[in-house]
């Protein structure tokens, strides 16, 4: 309920406290149009109320009969109340000094990066840089990431982030299987690889028929494997010389993947220099908090011959229309949004924001700073090794970078108890061994405390740190011949911005190049670019969430687990399902997990042969890519002229494949932006033929509070918390893709047995490296739901539908709306058909998208799900004023097109064909165009006082792919 204006309240006496409460205040901040604006839009649509509109849009047969059953969160909390409640949960976590290692380390996030990247909406509210001209800042930051990875690994080319180290290793496995055309189906994993990585690799291998073998690294060449995974350094700390082994593996016809620690590579010979084919790993220790497991940016680097088979996004250099350097996403034909089931991966949302943070950590410290950090870490480990040896303990590994495995024998349990008393976590290697992994946050005092713990267990006196330091030689415990001699990070960007002043200005210069939600609406269909409220974002940087190791003892993570349990129940309420897993760390991974759950269900019933997945022709590209990864055969179901699933074709395909039908994957509302009237019938047809129904949750923003997939026939869905539930897109990640299931599938949800996290014996294997995936950003969605409450979450959904229908109604006279439901209404998005315009004027959807940049807007989704169209999704967060500004821009562009159609403007020399227009072009001495500079730069009057200038002209995509270059550009190129 909208609280009343204070002037009206002041006229009443007496005032009550209840009348002055503002529990709904956040909803008014989140939902853009106020009551008057909503009524004006409803009047335009011909409806008396929002409820009447919703009744006309959503089929009555699937409407929720009850309010969202949010229990204690049904009533909204104010921002202050929600923050206080979450703070109480955070305070239940215990922040110990964690030396567990196993791929996760405490780190210092430089304050200038914390404030100006992680906490800066110019960075975290941006979308994936598919429109390169308005994404040059984050593209440069991601190119820096690629250069950093290439330099440190010694390989030829790197992508712009993957989800985590474990899934990166799994992607490397499938890359080698694709490219090598191997006779073998064996992938060999050395026994000192991180245990969580091994588990994810096994999960990925099983449905596609790869046999995973494990054993000593030394035996890898005899395994007959098409690929071998090595850890460098190993999980127990060993640093091994793998040169001879790599040669032997190659001689046997195999390839080598190395999971490498980037900080260690500043002092160790990089894998590319000793023959590795692929390197993968995590960049978390480059200034990104542990966050109970994520999010963190993984990396992959490969030899040149594998570049066109790499998964994920790749930033490349091209030229713009003026011949100046410009950045863009390269080789996109590898990706799921184009190649679908033939894609190199199902990755869509990755970890762009975290990759940017890691790259800026390298920029800020530079090569000398990184090496100093690495040498200091190694020195502390060496001093610890010397100290524990003095106390009578034996170190299992004689070579190390930052990790020691120590044989404590019968004193092991006592050692853990003494450490616990000092709020220290050690790794529990076995009943007789402990592991200690130090990091850049480990201080001299921390080292003294560690030595004191070992001394207490030994019944002796802790050695003096200074005395140990004085008696220890220079660089310790690195194998002879493995100390790095090659230069790295030589590009000027890593050697210039080392003062905070320079770094601050560099970050500002990059963010100024980009168009994010802090400047204007981003009406991308199927992407739900809604408000990421500041109060939702604040807890992400709390140390009680950030400094928790994912494998910390459960008694230290009580607050996290309570918050996660509450969020899971919130999502159960929203979806109508029975159980939720938050482990998948992207929507694509949630899809994949859901399909594995379906397979496990069929297998439990003796029907493991069911492997056909029906997918409508309009589906998002991740659907067929995920189905292929899950070992399923994709059978496409046609759509009818209205964009709905063709029921006759569905019946025929379901009947044809009745014996082996596993599932159907549908999106609801459909990818055409319509609530299909026959969704229950679709579900019934599939169930009748033995299949399960997967409802893609990408469009959940049109359903929350109004309908629920678990109630109209769905068996499993993934959600996108970075869409519906307010986690920001971060320029291409992070995301969270929970998988929600019906009661019959709950016992099959993902486990992580390697770390002791198990939901049940029948659960599928881990799909992410950490038990709860990207846990540290889950508070964002918790805050959103807590501050909205049941009623306002429903109101948000209704407003999203209202805004979309308002845009469709206003633009219909200018651009045909391709699909609609009864009464000409759409769901939360609409598709504008630009194909007739191309026929009459030669103007393409790409031209319109680029011209929108001159008007200060990011284009809607281009050519999905129908080529030659724009899909518009305004979300509930945009005000009527902003909607009207976008509508005015689209109408003005239509008039520019009409000028071409009528011959008043040239078919080639017009503002659309040459868009976007940079400041340099508009202010140049020569102006070669028939249209004016003013029309180019200021096509509407409002831009005169608030103008965003695209930093580059139109990027030449074909040139960039023909001349692939994915490293930092020399400064001379910008002259």
Swiss-Prot record:
Record NCBIfam families: gcvP, PRK04366.1
Q: Name one GO molecular function term.
A: pyridoxal phosphate binding
**E.C. number:** 1.4.4.2
Protein's name according to its UniProt entry: Glycine dehydrogenase (decarboxylating)
Q: Which Pfam families match?
A: GcvP2_C (PF21478), GDC-P (PF02347)
**Similarity comment: family membership:** Belongs to the GcvP family.
Function according to Swiss-Prot or TrEMBL? The glycine cleavage system catalyzes the degradation of glycine. The P protein binds the alpha-amino group of glycine through its pyridoxal phosphate cofactor; CO(2) is released and the remaining methylamine moiety is then transferred to the lipoamide cofactor of the H protein.
Q: Which reaction does it catalyse?
A: N(6)-[(R)-lipoyl]-L-lysyl-[glycine-cleavage complex H protein] + glycine + H(+) = N(6)-[(R)-S(8)-aminomethyldihydrolipoyl]-L-lysyl-[glycine-cleavage complex H protein] + CO2
Which cofactors, by name?
A: pyridoxal 5'-phosphate
Report the top EC class in one word. Answer: oxidoreductase
Q: How does it assemble?
A: The glycine cleavage system is composed of four proteins: P, T, L and H.
Q: Which residues carry this modification: N6-(pyridoxal phosphate)lysine?
A: 723
Q: Name one GO cellular component term.
A: cytosol
Keywords, ordered alphabetically: Oxidoreductase, Pyridoxal phosphate
| One BP annotation, GO | glycine decarboxylation via glycine cleavage system
């Amino acid at each position: 309920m909208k609280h009343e204006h204070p002037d009206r309240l002041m006229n009443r006496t007496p005032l009550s406290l209840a009348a002055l409460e503002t529990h709904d205040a956040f909803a008014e901040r989140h939902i853009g149009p106020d009551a008057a604006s909503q009524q004006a839009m409803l009047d335009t649509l011909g409806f008396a109320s929002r409820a009447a509109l919703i009744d006309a849009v959503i089929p009555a047969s699937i409407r929720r009969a009850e309010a969202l059953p949010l229990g204690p969160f049904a009533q909204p909390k104010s921002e202050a109340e929600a923050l206080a409640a979450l703070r109480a949960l955070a305070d239940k976590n215990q922040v110990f000094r964690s030396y567990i290692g196993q791929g996760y380390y405490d780190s210092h996030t430089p304050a200038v990066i914390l404030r100006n990247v992680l906490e800066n909406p110019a960075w975290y509210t941006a979308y994936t840089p598919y429109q390169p001209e308005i994404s040059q800042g984050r593209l440069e930051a991601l190119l820096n990431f690629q250069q950093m990875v290439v330099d440190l690994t010694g390989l030829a080319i790197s992508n712009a982030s993957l989800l985590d180290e474990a899934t990166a290793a799994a992607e490397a496995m499938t890359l080698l299987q694709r490219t090598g055309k191997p006779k073998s189906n064996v992938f060999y994993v050395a026994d000192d690889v991180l245990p969580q990585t091994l588990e994810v690799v096994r999960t990925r291998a099983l449905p596609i028929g790869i046999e995973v073998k494990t054993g000593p690294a030394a035996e890898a060449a005899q395994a007959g494997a098409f690929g071998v995974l090595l850890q460098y350094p190993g999980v127990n700390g060993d640093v091994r010389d793998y040169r001879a082994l790599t040669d032997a593996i190659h001689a046997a016809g195999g390839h080598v993947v190395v999971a490498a620690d980037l900080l260690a590579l500043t002092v160790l010979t990089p894998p590319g220099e000793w023959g590795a084919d692929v390197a993968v790993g995590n960049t978390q220790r480059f200034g990104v908090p542990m966050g109970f497991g994520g999010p963190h940016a993984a990396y992959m680097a490969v030899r040149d011959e594998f570049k066109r088979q790499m998964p994920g996004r790749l930033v490349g250099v091209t030229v713009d229309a003026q011949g100046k350097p410009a950045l863009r996403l390269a080789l996109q034909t590898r990706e799921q949004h184009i190649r679908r089931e033939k894609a190199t991966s199902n990755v869509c949302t990755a970890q762009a924001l975290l990759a940017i943070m890691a790259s800026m950590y390298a920029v800020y410290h530079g090569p000398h700073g990184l090496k100093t950090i690495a040498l200091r870490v190694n020195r502390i480990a060496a001093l610890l090794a010397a100290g524990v040896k003095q106390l009578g303990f034996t170190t299992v590994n004689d070579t190390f970078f930052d990790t020691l495995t120590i044989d404590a024998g019968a004193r092991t349990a006592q050692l853990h108890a003494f450490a616990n008393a000092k709020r220290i976590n050690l790794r529990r290697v076995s009943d007789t061994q402990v592991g200690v992994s130090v990091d850049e946050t480990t201080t001299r005092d921390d080292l003294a405390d560690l030595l004191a713990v070992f001394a207490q267990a030994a019944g002796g006196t802790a050695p003096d740190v200074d005395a140990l330091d004085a008696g220890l030689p220079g660089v310790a415990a690195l194998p002879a011949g493995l100390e790095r001699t090659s230069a790295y990070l030589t590009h000027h960007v890593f050697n210039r911005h080392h003062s905070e002043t320079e770094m601050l200005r560099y970050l500002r210069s990059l963010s100024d190049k980009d168009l994010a939600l802090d400047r204007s609406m981003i009406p991308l269909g199927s992407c739900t670019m809604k408000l990421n409220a500041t109060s939702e974002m604040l807890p992400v940087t709390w140390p009680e969430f950030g400094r928790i190791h994912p494998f910390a003892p459960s008694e230290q993570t009580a607050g996290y687990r309570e918050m996660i349990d509450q969020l899971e129940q919130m999502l159960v309420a929203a979806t109508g399902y029975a159980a939720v897993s938050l482990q998948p760390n992207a929507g694509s991974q949630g899809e994949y997990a859901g399909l594995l759950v379906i397979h496990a269900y069929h297998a439990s019933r003796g029907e493991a042969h069911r492997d056909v997945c029906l997918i409508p022709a309009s589906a998002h590209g991740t659907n067929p890519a995920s189905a292929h990864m899950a070992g399923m055969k994709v059978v496409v179901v046609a759509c009818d002229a209205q964009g709905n699933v063709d029921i006759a074709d569905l019946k025929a395909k379901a009947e044809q494949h009745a014996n082996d039908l596993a599932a159907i994957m549908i999106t609801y509302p459909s990818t055409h932006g319509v609530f299909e009237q026959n969704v229950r019938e679709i579900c019934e047809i599939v169930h009748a033929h033995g299949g399960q129904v997967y409802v893609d949750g990408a469009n959940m923003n049109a359903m929350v509070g109004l309908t629920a997939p678990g109630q109209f026939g769905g068996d499993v869905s993934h959600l996108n918390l970075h869409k519906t539930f307010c986690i920001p897109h971060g320029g291409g990640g992070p995301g969270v893709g929970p998988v929600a299931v019906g009661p019959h599938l709950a016992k099959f949800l993902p486990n992580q047995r390697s770390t002791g996290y198990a939901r049940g014996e029948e659960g599928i294997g881990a799909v992410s490296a950490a038990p709860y995936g990207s846990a540290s950003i889950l508070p964002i969605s918790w805050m959103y739901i807590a501050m909205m409450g049941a009623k306002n979450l429903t109101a948000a959904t209704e407003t999203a539908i209202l805004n979309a229908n308002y845009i469709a109604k206003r633009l219909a006279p200018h651009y045909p709306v391709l699909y609609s439901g009864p009464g000409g209404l759409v769901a939360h998005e609409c598709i504008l058909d630009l194909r007739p315009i191309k026929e009459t004027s030669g103007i393409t959807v790409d031209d319109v998208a680029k011209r929108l940049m001159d008007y200060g807007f990011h284009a809607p989704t281009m050519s999905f799900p129908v080529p030659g169209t724009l899909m518009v999704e305004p979300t509930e967060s945009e005000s009527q004023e902003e909607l009207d500004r976008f509508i005015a821009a689209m109408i003005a562009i239509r008039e520019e097109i009409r000028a071409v159609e009528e011959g008043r403007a040239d078919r080639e020399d017009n503002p659309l064909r040459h868009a976007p227009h940079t400041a340099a072009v508009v202010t140049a001495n020569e102006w070669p165009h028939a249209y004016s500079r003013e029309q180019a730069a200021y096509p509407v009057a409002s831009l005169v006082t608030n103008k965003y200038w695209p930093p580059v002209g139109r990027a030449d995509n074909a040139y960039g792919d023909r001349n692939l270059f994915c490293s930092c550009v020399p400064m001379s190129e910008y002259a």
